[in-house]
Every structure is written in C-alpha cells, then in structure tokens.
Amino acid sequence: SGPISSADEVNVVKICGTVSKFRGTPQITVDRIRLADDNDTYDLSALVPVAPIDVDTTMAEVERLISSITDADYRKICSTMMARHKESLKTIPAAKSVHHGFISGLLMHTATMMKTADFLAGLYGDIIDRSLLLAGTFLHDFAKEKEFTFSQLGLVTEYSVKGQLLGHLVMGAQEVSNVAAELGIPEDKSVLLQHMILSHHGEPEFGAAVKPICAESELLSQIDMLDSRMEIYRETLAGLQVGEVSSRIFALDKRVFKPHELNG
C-alpha cells in the first residue's frame, strides 16, 4: 500500500527486524515495515492507554441508571440513544488530551458522572428533577463521536470539520431534538434536555453555548467539572513521587502536589 509516511502516525504497523541493545537499552533494527491490516491480531491495551474499568460492568451500570429514570419520556430518549451509540460509547475517548483521553474514556466519564448525579439528586431532592438530571448527564457528551476523528487505534487524532464548525454541544442538542421529535416527546422536555447539553460547560468562556439557568443544568455543569478535574489530578499524580510537585498543568492553570501514595 506504499511506504510509511507521517500521515500514518498513530496507526498500527507490523515490523520485521532484529532486537538488540544499545548502551543497555533495547532497540530494533527494522528490515521491513508495513501498516497492519485486518488479518493481523494484536492486543489494543498493550499499544495505547485504556480506561481502568471493566467495560461490560460499567456499561451495565449506565444501563441500570437509565432504567431507573422514572420519567418515561426522558427514559425513552436515553434508551434510544443508547441503542444507536452503544458500540461507540464502549470504546471512544472523551477528549484528545485534557481528560479521559484514552480508550473507553467517554464511558468511564459518563458512568462516573451518572453515579455522582444519582447521589446528588437525592441530596438536593427538593429542587432537582432526578430524571432530567440523569438524562442530561447521560446525553451531555454523546456528540463527541462526531466532534472528533479517530485513528486506527481508536484514539482522537483531530477535530472533525463539523466538530470545528459546530462543536459537540450544538451537535448533541441537534440530535436530541431530532430523536425527541421522532419519538413524539413533548417539546418542553426536549428543550430542557437541549439546554442541559448546551450549558454543561458552565460559562461561555469555557465553551458553553448558554449559561445553565435551571438547578439541574447548574448541577450537571458542576458534576462535569468535578469529574474532569479529578481525572486530570489522577493522571498527573500517577506520574509523581510522594512529596513531588508537578510542573504547571495547563488545564488546571496550576501545579499539583502529591502528599501520599495513591489508593490502589
């Protein structure tokens, strides 16, 4: 299929060569190299970072929470979206690099957020519609599948043209609007879900199309911020020694200190 070029970056290649050591470090003298094809077998987790979760168990947790949504309209939209996107939800990252930028990252992010939303819906039950919060949490990042382009390994390579022109908030709201219309969901509920998606970045300077103006959308934006920042801490702390301070973390606009060993 032609020589390997820079355009093949982040794709899998098959190499034939000789392994030796140079100054104590293993190296390969390459005799032949080609792009891997469908006949080649390899363990994806040995080549790229993957979420530290059991995918099937985590997917079952998400499906259980969807089933627990008591409002039939919100539950129907979520079930329909799950049926259409389940396979991609199992594998795609949630970002290119900032947080959850690994295989199954979006599933991990969504599941953690839904469990947090479920807890907080009970804590603030006097003002929160649990069904709306859980549905909005499940749906908030679905359009990332369209926002990014992906390598052969499943990692994010770039933003798609639509991703650059519209972004996942607008595309997500559009899809929810279309699905709600197909299912005959009342417009007021469709608009509320669209608002949840469009406002979940909290402030326009952080990418929100509109500010969250209902309790559920405010809570969703805070849950999203919490989980994304904790994942940034997790990834940063994993590379530090106890007592060490990191270099400046761009996404946090500060350094990170590791006071103790991680749990597990």
Regions found by a protein language model. Name each.
Residues 221, 243-255, 260-264:
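N-terminal intrinsically disordered, cationic/polar leader segments
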Residues 25-93:
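Extended, charge-rich, solvent-exposed interface segments
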Residues 18-23:
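Short, charged beta-turn/beta-strand-edge "cap" motif at the junction between a beta-strand
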Residues 10, 113, 224:
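Divalent metal-coordination and catalytic microenvironments
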Residues 1-16:
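Short nucleic-acid-contacting surface segments enriched for D/E, G, S/T with interspersed K/R
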Residues 44-50, 100-103, 160-164:
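A ubiquitous short alpha-helical element
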Residues 74-118, 139-147:
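A short mid-domain helix/strand-loop element embedded in enzyme catalytic domains
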Residues 98, 108, 119-240:
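Divalent metal-dependent catalytic cores for phosphoryl transfer on phosphate-bearing substrates
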